[in-house]
């Protein structure tokens, strides 16, 4: 038994949203009680007690779109790299990195990403992986890191024809084999999806192969209209818009997650809504790659299930929230834009996305939900109550303030110390692997 208490509790449970001095009791991987600290301690007097010391207790974060393979690009300088547009960024940086990744480097990239996620209070990660230098077994390598560190993750491999049809088919099979493996796993900690890069690097032949081989019970995870070229190529080569093409290939549906969706029109948004397809917004990436601002507020208003990701830019979901908030205010010239929509995406949207792949209810502190809890070192200088929670979180909190992270009932970090690995050794191994990758890229 584990009890975390003596903190301001944000539950994300509409029936009981805020407790001034709250506690949460966990038995194994399940929350068994949420209430006032003294009452919870009376019911479970012998439980291990973690003192939040007046900080914020809340559900752990979920990242709905991540790129583990990008970990070693931090600080990387590639000879001759001078991008003039999004395609140059893809080919000159990201595809260059993924073509050189070894299996061991992929695994260490996963350790780096998951450790940083833990330190930012993220316990569930939807990753979209690519390592065309070594495809087969890459998802199992990432899974090993996830299991070792105790995080929950949904994985896929980025199918693409960009490096030839042989590697494209190998990437299809990497997805198929991992999905079957994940479906047979009863831990509720591992899931798989059919990963796809984007429409403009996937032929009809490959689309057909994916349709033929995709196991039942899962959907696709694909970038959609992230750059304008993706749309232009689809119109020119296929005579239709991207979402229409995906619909024609039976890609859309309640288990499918579309990343970005910058260049989509009203008809496409209606199609996404009608098929109950999920969308994930990645604000920092869209801005950093100069791709544009998606009509995310319109999607949320239409009732499309929309979540929030980071696309590898950060592992701090609070940072992604802050950026999304100002991006849409700036883009729409509306000071009211994004105030309610973005936290809805982060908390409600990401939780619903995760619950389409994991059985235990995530993203909420209530009886029967998953024991995924974080403690944040935040002492508000103004009154805090259920009516102003989001204002406190957005303006007062960042990921580095997370003190304790619990996933599936296991304490992964306490008082900023990662307990599930030798962090210093892992980081040293990562630095060496990153140097070897950079040396290999630059020859």
Name these PLM-found stretches.
Residues 129, 134-262:
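Metal-coordinating catalytic core of metallo-dependent amide/deamination hydrolases
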Residues 150, 214-219, 251-254, 271-280, ...:
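Glycine-enriched alpha-helix->loop->beta-strand junction motifs that scaffold or abut catalytic
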Residues 248-251, 255, 297-380, 394-398:
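His/Asp/Glu-enriched, well-ordered alpha-helical/loop segment
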Residues 72-106, 162-164, 228-255, 275-278, ...:
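Active-site gating loops and adjacent loop-to-helix segments of metal-dependent hydrolytic enzymes
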Residues 7, 24, 29, 54, ...:
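Divalent metal-coordination and catalytic microenvironments
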Residues 76-128, 133-151, 173-185, 431-440:
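Alpha-helical scaffold segments that flank or form the walls of functional sites
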């Amino acid at each position: 038994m584990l009890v975390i208490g003596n903190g301001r509790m944000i539950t994300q449970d509409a029936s009981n949203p805020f407790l001034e001095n709250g506690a949460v009791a966990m038995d194994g991987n399940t929350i068994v009680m949420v209430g006032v600290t003294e009452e919870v301690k009376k019911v479970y007097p012998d439980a291990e007690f973690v003192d939040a010391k007046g900080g914020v207790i809340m559900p752990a974060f979920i990242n709905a779109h991540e790129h583990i393979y990008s970990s070693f690009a931090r600080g990387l300088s590639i000879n001759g790299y001078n991008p003039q547009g999004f395609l140059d960024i893809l080919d000159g940086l990201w595809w260059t990195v993924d073509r050189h990744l070894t299996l061991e480097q992929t695994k260490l990239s996963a350790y780096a990403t998951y450790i940083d996620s833990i330190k930012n209070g993220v316990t569930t990660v939807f990753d979209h992986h690519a390592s065309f230098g070594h495809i087969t077994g890459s998802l199992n390598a990432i899974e090993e890191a996830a299991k070792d560190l105790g995080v929950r993750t949904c994985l896929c491999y980025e199918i693409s024809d960009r490096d030839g049809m042989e590697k494209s088919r190998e990437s299809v099979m990497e997805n198929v084999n991992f999905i079957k493996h994940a479906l047979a796993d009863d831990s509720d900690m591992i899931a798989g999806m059919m990963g796809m890069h984007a429409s403009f690097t996937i032929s009809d032949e490959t689309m057909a192969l994916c349709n033929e081989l995709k196991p039942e019970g899962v959907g696709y995870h694909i970038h959609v209209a992230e750059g304008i070229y993706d749309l232009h190529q689809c119109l020119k080569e296929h005579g239709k818009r991207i979402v229409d093409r995906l619909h024609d290939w039976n890609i859309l549906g309640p288990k499918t997650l579309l990343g970005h969706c910058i260049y989509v029109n009203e008809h496409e948004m209606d199609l996404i809504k009608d098929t109950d397809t999920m969308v994930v917004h990645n604000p920092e990436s869209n801005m950093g790659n100069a791709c544009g601002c998606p009509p995310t507020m319109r999607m949320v208003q239409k009732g499309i299930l929309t979540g929030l990701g980071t696309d590898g830019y950060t592992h701090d979901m609070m940072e992604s929230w802050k950026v999304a908030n100002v991006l849409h205010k700036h883009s729409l010239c509306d000071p009211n834009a994004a105030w309610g929509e973005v936290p809805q995406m982060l908390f409600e949207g990401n939780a619903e996305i995760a619950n389409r792949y994991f059985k235990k209810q995530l993203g909420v502190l209530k009886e029967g939900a998953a024991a995924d809890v974080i403690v944040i070192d935040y002492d508000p200088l103004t009154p805090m109550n259920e009516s102003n929670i989001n204002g406190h979180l957005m303006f007062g909190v960042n990921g580095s303030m997370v003190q304790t992270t619990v996933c599936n009932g296991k304490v992964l970090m306490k008082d900023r110390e990662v307990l599930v690995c030798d962090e210093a050794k892992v980081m040293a191994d990562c630095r060496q692997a990153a140097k070897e990758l950079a040396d290999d890229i630059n020859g």
